[in-house]
């Protein structure tokens, strides 16, 4: 055997000689010398209350959902609660929630983005739910600033307060995250995913805005450049019978008399140009001046 082959064989067996036996690594029970046992997982931190979520249970039907709701009535609303599971699925409930928060165009825009939508019961108000959007690439969480609640009378999801323009929208933040996403999943050594940015409770935030927000004063209307009064109900000329044109050159009567001279149809044409006999009788407005009738049916 050559020296090269001797060195290669020694190098290939040196690692095996340094290894411990199987019984020393996993114990005599799991090494085949006794019964096979599975190591128990360490218990969770007793100080931290365990939150019951829908991820731990697979609800395959309405009866399974009702069974879970009966066993855990205080925890069923914590996450992804469906108000009427016999009528709607989770996918339909998600779409109804987005349509309650935003317009249909914005809701479809959110559904196209790479985010999973979930909703969780608020600790401040049990009737409200906080909607969160989780990135499918990096597991980043974005909370919607507007809470939502279920209205059982009409059977729809409605916003907590009519303050969408004040509290803001999550669509812009989601677009910004989508452009700057690192596309890297968090480390598997961490038991939990990345925590969202700490912020105020959306329910308390909306209450604070509603309490301290003052509506902006309306801007004054821009006046006309010539500052001349327009014909309106406050104008004295508008209440006077007769033609509104004060220039005799543009009065339809003299124009017609100049064009047609002495025509038998001149009064009829003038009456029809001013609005007809009904207009003249009721409103007293004619190009011929004040109404010629008795005025019993005249308004002005």
Curated annotation (Swiss-Prot):
Instruction: Give GO MF terms, alphabetically.
Output: DNA binding
Entry's Pfam families? Foamy_BEL
Which domain of life does the UniProt lineage start with? Viruses
Kindly state a single biological-process term from the GO annotations of this entry.
Answer: viral process
Q: Which UniProt keywords apply?
A: Activator, DNA-binding, Host nucleus, Transcription, Transcription regulation
Q: List the disulfide bonds.
A: none
Compositional bias of type Basic residues: which residue ranges?
211-222
Q: Does the keyword DNA-binding apply?
A: yes
- Enumerate the residue ranges of region (Transactivation domain): 224-300
> Sorted alphabetically, which InterPro entries does this protein's record hold?
Foamy_BEL
Which residue ranges hold the DNA-binding region? 89-200
Q: Where in the cell is it found?
A: Host nucleus
List the signal peptide residues: none
Positions of short motif Nuclear localization signal: 214-223
| UniProt biased composition (Polar residues) | 10-23, 227-237
**How is the quaternary structure described?**
Homodimer or homomultimer. Forms complexes with the host nuclear factors NFIA, NFIB, NFIC or NFIX.
Q: What does this protein do?
A: Transcriptional transactivator that activates the viral internal promoter (IP), thereby enhancing its own expression. This transactivation is repressed by nuclear factor I. Also transactivates the long terminal repeat (LTR) promoter, thereby inducing structural gene expression, initiating the late phase of infection. It is therefore a key regulator of viral gene expression. It directly binds to and activates DNA target sites of viral promoters and those of distinct cellular genes. Required for viral replication.
| UniProt name for this protein | Protein Bel-1
Source species, please?
Answer: Human spumaretrovirus
């Amino acid at each position: 055997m050559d020296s090269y082959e001797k060195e290669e064989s020694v190098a290939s067996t040196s690692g095996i000689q340094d290894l411990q036996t199987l019984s020393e690594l996993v114990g005599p029970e799991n090494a085949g010398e006794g019964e096979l046992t599975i190591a128990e997982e360490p218990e969770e931190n007793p100080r931290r209350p365990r939150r019951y979520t829908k991820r731990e249970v697979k609800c395959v039907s309405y009866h399974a959902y009702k069974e879970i709701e009966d066993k855990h009535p205080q925890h069923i609303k914590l996450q992804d609660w469906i108000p009427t599971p016999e009528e709607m699925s989770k996918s339909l409930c998600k779409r109804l929630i987005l349509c309650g928060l935003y317009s249909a165009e914005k809701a479809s825009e959110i559904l196209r983005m790479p985010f999973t939508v979930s909703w969780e019961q608020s600790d401040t108000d049990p009737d409200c739910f906080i909607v969160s959007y989780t990135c499918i690439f990096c597991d980043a969480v974005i909370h919607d600033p507007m809470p939502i609640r279920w209205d059982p009378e009409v059977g729809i999801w409605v916003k907590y307060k009519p303050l969408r323009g004040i509290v803001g929208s999550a669509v812009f933040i989601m677009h910004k995250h989508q452009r700057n996403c690192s596309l890297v999943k968090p480390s598997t050594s961490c038991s939990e995913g990345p925590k969202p940015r700490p912020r105020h409770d959306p329910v308390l935030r909306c209450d604070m805005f509603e309490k301290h927000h003052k509506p902006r004063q309306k801007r004054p209307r821009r006046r006309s450049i010539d500052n001349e009064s327009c014909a309106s109900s406050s104008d004295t000329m508008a209440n006077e019978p007769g033609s509104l044109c004060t220039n005799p050159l543009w009065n339809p009567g003299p124009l017609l008399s100049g064009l047609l001279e002495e025509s038998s149809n001149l009064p009829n044409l003038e009456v029809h140009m001013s609005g007809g006999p009904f207009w003249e009788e009721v409103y007293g407005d004619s190009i011929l001046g004040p109404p010629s009738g008795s005025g019993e049916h005249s308004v002005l």
